[in-house]
């Protein structure tokens, strides 16, 4: 990259520092801040839909939409420039900006976005580029962006809303994002004399005047609990998305795409939130099917499968994510049938097995099985749910703790003796999601000694995010065990306290020869040795808990006695045996017994 064009957004409406900018840059375009009085309800709805009222200040809305206008200007330009430097008026431009610009362009290579801003300490000779750090809160102050990245962003915004796009940039490095270190600019907008009006924005409801020949509209009604995909878009865009997928039944005006809709008598009320008349759009060609939905009961489907077993083979469809993440559970189902054939999603089949990650396929005349990973699913129309908690909304619940499924995600050893090493650190805490109880316990234990926060939540250690790592060689679980193996303790906190719900949060520290300080349901202690843990609910108050942790930390013999406890209650514990029992239990469903709940 040899050159770039500069775009300056004049936030406050007056030309602060423009003279110094012009001294350093040629061909700089200036865009004045938008007038919020000229912004239509449609624009605000399209950009900021799916966030609660009053969530954004006027300042935030203006800033984001100003940058959106700059992106549109770039996308629509006919110049031959591929790189653009967008700067906010509310930044200090150092005298050395010309030099830093040249250094930055030389180091940019083929990165799509480079953020700058946040630090006034500038050492040009030490300038370098690194992957974007989401903790940099001033990323909209100034950045280089390619025309290609701009077009990708605009397309993403069209379907997902602008605020979601910004979050995507921050958290997922959308479009190969990098940043310059040291930063080029220091944000000083707090010192401006002209302060934005920081009043809250309330989203105005707009008219719903859309009538489509190929859809039936149900005003203020919805098929609740049966959603698979949410899109932050207006009604015409939602229809466009729904029409691209033949398996899609319809959508509601809140933005939920439907791959299944209940019978009309089971519809629920939908309040007007975005439009003066929110509701449900259903494709006309599916409407008659909806009215006949669920006329075949689960027990009738079981009888049909049973007859197939005695006369021929059973056709089974398995979706891709069930194959990728839960093949051990799929196999537990397949073992039941001596004669079966795996078929594709467009074929006729007797049984479907879906994992709730991708879009699942549901047919009312087949026996539909759902495999879940999270504890809060509220899906009512599957015949069977292999669930991580004791109860589900399906006709039949088969309980299988996620902690054991997570052990199948490992690519490396599950034997704790393979991870014996000196404990050089105190306590680890590795989470992405910021739940209040997690932060509370992190702060509590940190009162005693520093707890290393290895994830995005409360992060205080420079470490690469591995939460999405999932390859043939290793997964995030393997990485967690390697990290934990250096620590005496691990704060092992589930995201929710739900009967039967336990995950890798408990088992990974134990495999790593650390002591988990565990918060979660106690049902799992049927299989896992509670003496090998510090179980938070056993302590009446935080003082007793913290004293217990201190006592173990300072008493080597006590620490060793806990570490030397067996991990499993059953000395012959085996995942293979658990899955064999699971298969036997699922097989009972297709016997003459009427069963609603099965446990391992």
Swiss-Prot record:
Domain of life according to the entry: Viruses
Q: What Gene Ontology molecular function terms does this protein carry?
A: alpha-(1->3)-fucosyltransferase activity
**Enzyme Commission number, as recorded:** 2.4.1.-
| Cross-referenced InterPro entries | Glyco_tran_10_C, Glyco_trans_10, GT10-like_C_sf
Kindly report, in one word, the top-level EC class recorded for this enzyme: transferase
GO cellular component terms, alphabetically, are: membrane
User: Coiled-coil stretches, from where to where?
Assistant: none
Check the UniProt entry and state the signal peptide residues, or none.
Answer: none
Which keywords has UniProt assigned to this entry? Glycosyltransferase, Transferase
Which BP terms in the Gene Ontology apply to this protein? fucosylation; protein glycosylation
PANTHER family according to UniProt: ALPHA- 1,3 -FUCOSYLTRANSFERASE, ALPHA-(1,3)-FUCOSYLTRANSFERASE 10
Assigned protein family: Belongs to the glycosyltransferase 10 family.
The protein's name? Putative fucosyltransferase R654
Q: Which organism is it from?
A: Acanthamoeba polyphaga mimivirus (APMV)
């Amino acid at each position: 990259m040899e050159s770039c064009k500069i775009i300056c957004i004049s936030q406050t409406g007056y030309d602060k520092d423009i003279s110094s900018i012009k001294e350093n840059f040629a061909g700089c375009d200036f865009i004045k801040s938008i007038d919020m009085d000229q912004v239509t309800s449609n624009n605000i709805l399209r950009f900021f839909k799916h966030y609660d009222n009053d969530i954004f200040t006027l300042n935030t809305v203006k800033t984001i939409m100003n940058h959106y206008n700059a992106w549109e200007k770039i996308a629509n330009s006919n110049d031959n420039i591929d790189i653009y430097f967008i700067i906010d008026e509310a930044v200090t431009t150092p005298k050395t900006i010309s030099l830093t610009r040249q250094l930055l362009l030389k180091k940019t290579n083929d990165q799509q976005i480079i953020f700058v801003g946040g630090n006034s300490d500038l050492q040009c000779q030490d300038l370098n580029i690194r992957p974007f750090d989401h903790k940099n809160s001033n990323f909209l102050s100034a950045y280089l962006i390619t025309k290609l990245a701009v077009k990708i962003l605009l397309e993403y915004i069209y379907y997902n809303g602008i605020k979601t796009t910004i979050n995507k940039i921050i958290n997922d490095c959308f479009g190969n994002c990098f940043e310059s270190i040291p930063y080029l600019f220091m944000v000083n907008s707090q010192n401006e004399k002209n302060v934005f009006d920081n009043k809250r924005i309330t989203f105005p409801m707009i008219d719903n005047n859309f009538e489509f020949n190929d859809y039936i509209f149900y005003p203020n009604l919805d098929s609740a609990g049966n959603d698979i995909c949410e899109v932050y878009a207006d009604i015409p865009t939602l229809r466009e998305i729904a029409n691209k997928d033949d398996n899609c039944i319809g959508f509601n005006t809140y933005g939920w795409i439907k791959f299944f809709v209940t019978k009309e008598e089971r519809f629920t009320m939908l309040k007007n939130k975005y439009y003066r008349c929110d509701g449900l759009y259903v494709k006309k060609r599916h409407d008659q099917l909806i009215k006949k939905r669920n006329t075949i009961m689960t027990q009738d489907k079981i009888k049909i499968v049973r007859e197939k077993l005695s006369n021929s083979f059973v056709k089974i469809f398995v979706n891709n994510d069930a194959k990728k993440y839960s093949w051990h559970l799929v196999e537990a189902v397949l073992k039941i049938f001596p004669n079966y054939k795996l078929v594709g999603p467009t074929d006729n089949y007797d049984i479907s097995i879906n994992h709730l990650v991708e879009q699942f396929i549901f047919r009312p005349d087949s026996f539909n099985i759902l495999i879940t990973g999270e504890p809060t699913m509220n899906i009512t129309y599957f015949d069977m749910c292999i669930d991580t908690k004791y109860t589900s909304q399906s006709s039949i619940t088969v309980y299988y703790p996620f902690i054991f499924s997570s052990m199948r995600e490992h690519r490396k050893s599950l034997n704790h003796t393979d991870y014996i090493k000196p404990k050089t650190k105190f306590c680890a805490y590795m989470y992405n999601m910021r739940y209040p109880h997690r932060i509370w316990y992190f702060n509590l234990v940190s009162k005693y000694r520093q707890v290393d926060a290895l994830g995005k939540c409360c992060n205080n250690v420079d470490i690469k995010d591995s939460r999405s790592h999932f390859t043939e060689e290793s997964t995030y679980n393997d990485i967690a065990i390697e990290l934990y193996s250096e620590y005496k303790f691990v704060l092992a906190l589930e995201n929710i306290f739900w009967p039967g719900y336990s995950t890798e949060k408990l088992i990974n520290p134990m495999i790593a020869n650390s002591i988990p300080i565990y918060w979660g349901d106690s049902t799992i202690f049927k299989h896992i040795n509670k003496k090998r843990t510090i179980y938070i609910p056993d302590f009446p108050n935080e003082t007793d808990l913290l004293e217990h942790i201190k006592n173990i930390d300072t008493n080597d013999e006590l620490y060793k006695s806990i570490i030397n406890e067996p991990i499993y209650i059953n000395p012959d514990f085996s995942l293979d045996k658990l899955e064999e029992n699971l298969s036997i239990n699922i097989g009972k469903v297709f016997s003459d017994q009427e069963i609603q709940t099965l446990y391992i």
